[in-house]
Amino acid sequence: MPHISYPVIFNNVESFGQFLLGNTEILSYFFITFDFALSIGKTQINLLLPATFPYLRKGRPKTINFRIMPDFVHLHVHTQYSILDGAAAISPLIKRAKALGMKALAITDHGNMYGVKNFHDVATDAGIKPILGCETYVVRNRFEKDKDEKAGDHLILLAKNLTGYHNLCKIVSYSFTEGFYYKPRIDKKLLEQYHEGLICCSACLGGEVPQAIMRNDMEEAEQVVRWFKSVFGDDYYLELQLHPSGDPRKDADVYENQLLVNKALLELSAKCGVKYICSNDVHFILAEDAVAHDHLICLNTGRDLDAVSYTHL
């Protein structure tokens, strides 16, 4: 029997069951009804080891605590259709999500919905619920061509129903036909007009709320949160991210700021009555793809590899 560290944490009930099936010594002592545990929302199972259990070590507690984590869904995901930024091809991405036992997955490419049809079809065929979205760029006025605002603040929009999908298509279309300046851009008037059926998330460090927090302008951050809540109601979420890289240069630019922003977002959540989610800024599939992704960023920005500071997980 392999060495087991306690408590043992599993991503879902299925992986817990696979663990037990792979350790028949444990199964010979216990019988657990997983369906019942699920029906009552049970996420923690305690197993009491009898004194005769052959692998009970001296000094080890006799109760093994198994904690089953709730299902996690990636809601901030960039595919290869985030041009010169995303390095996750759709089919391998869905295959990886399936292997990890994920039941749903979002697509939120930068400023476009080019990959939505392919993503929807591949995910559906794999039995994964596709969540269709976009990471938009928000400026004060989409009609103004101001170089100081050509980038815009990042904002995640997710369609929660057919109405939301239609409104998302309209918003993204207008970002090209009316707001394009270096990038497809939208403004808050479009959000007010076409918010129905959409879930809105505050996005990464490039979002309007995190940017205000990093400027130490909590008053502005609160005003922005309250505006989005007034438009989207309970469908507005603050987005927490944490991406330690192990590289001191990158961590100083990203991870340390994320720690600062997350603390402030949690305070704003409590103060403004806004819910929050946890996400990863997914741009590639496997950890070993990070180097290739850094090269892609260099092609996009024209910077040297040593100057790349932002890495995605």
Task: Give the label of every model feature segment.
Residues F19:
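Cationic, low-complexity basic patches in intrinsically disordered or flexible, solvent-exposed regions
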Residues N11, F16, D35, F53-P54:
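Ser/Thr/Pro/Gly-rich low-complexity, intrinsically disordered segments
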Residues Y29, N46-L47, Y55, I64-L313:
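Phosphodiester-processing cores and adjacent nucleic acid-binding clamps
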